[in-house]
Amino acid sequence: MTIVNEKEINAEMVIQVAKLMAVSARTAPKARGNDNLEILIITGETIVRLSEKMKALGTETGSPFFLRDAQNILPSPAVVLLGTTIKTQGLKKCGMCGFANCAEKEKHPLHPCIFNAHDLGLAVGSAVSVAAAHHIDNRVMYTAGQAAMELKLFSGDVRIAFAIPLSATQKSPFFDRPAV
């Protein structure tokens, strides 16, 4: 008879759920069917690099929540990164980005398209629902998304990103965090 101790498979199972989250995020609805998302899973040393970049950003900008979140992600066996490029939908009538239409918005390429941000939000929601369904603790962090973009972890021209660190321990490290 084989005996498997949960502690021996914990990190492996968290990574397995991260993979399910990535697939769920990919299949989330997208405006006009246009997929501008990039979805990554990082582990090990890459999480350490991400944490170090978050600390640097926190120090450079005087933002203590970057420092708090940098510590918060270190025990995670996996972090899911989700980002989007900025591409308009070619609409003649919209204005939700603040410009009259997509042609006007195109003159300001760094200004986000609401549909890209919305698609990213749907993907994040789909991903965290998978984590919740598997009782994996998680937290959506813009701080880690910012650091991932600074580190150029994404291969594409990602301009908006979030990170979802994961944990399966006796107590969620993402819940009772100090407010800063």
Describe each model-derived feature in a short phrase:
Residues 1-180:
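Acidic, surface-exposed loops and disordered segments
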